[in-house]
């Protein structure tokens, strides 16, 4: 499914964000629930803490360093995209650093 084909319709996007807890099965559960609820797309976020914050901030702030736990592992991408296809929903993901665009390209429409 390509969302662009639905130009005149309301689209429902389930925002998982970083609530996956780096757990693939939890991510699958979000996708399955979103599909069952009738969502058109499931959206994640792809970021790397060292790309978001300066080394000085990360060195001084444990709170910021702990956000590394929120990162979506790149190895999840093909499996998340496949699970979305299986559920007939679109996989989408916000890239937060330039290289993320290339990393996501094979998996998004």
Predicted regions and their residues:
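Glycine-rich, proline-tolerant flexible connector loops at the mouths of alpha/beta enzymes
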Residues: 40-72
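Hydrophobic faces of well-ordered beta-strands that scaffold small-molecule active sites
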Residues: 12-14, 42-44, 91-93, 109
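Short amphipathic alpha-helices and their capping/turn segments at secondary-structure boundaries
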Residues: 1, 27-43
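Conserved, mostly hydrophobic/aromatic
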Residues: 15, 34, 104
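Active-site beta->alpha loop and helix N-cap motifs at the rims of alpha/beta catalytic domains
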Residues: 60-109
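Active-site beta-loop-alpha junctions enriched in small/polar residues
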Residues: 17-19, 45-49, 96-98
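Catalytic cores of alpha/beta
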Residues: 24-31, 100-106
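N-terminal amphipathic alpha-helix/helix-capping segment at the start of soluble metabolic enzymes
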Residues: 1-14
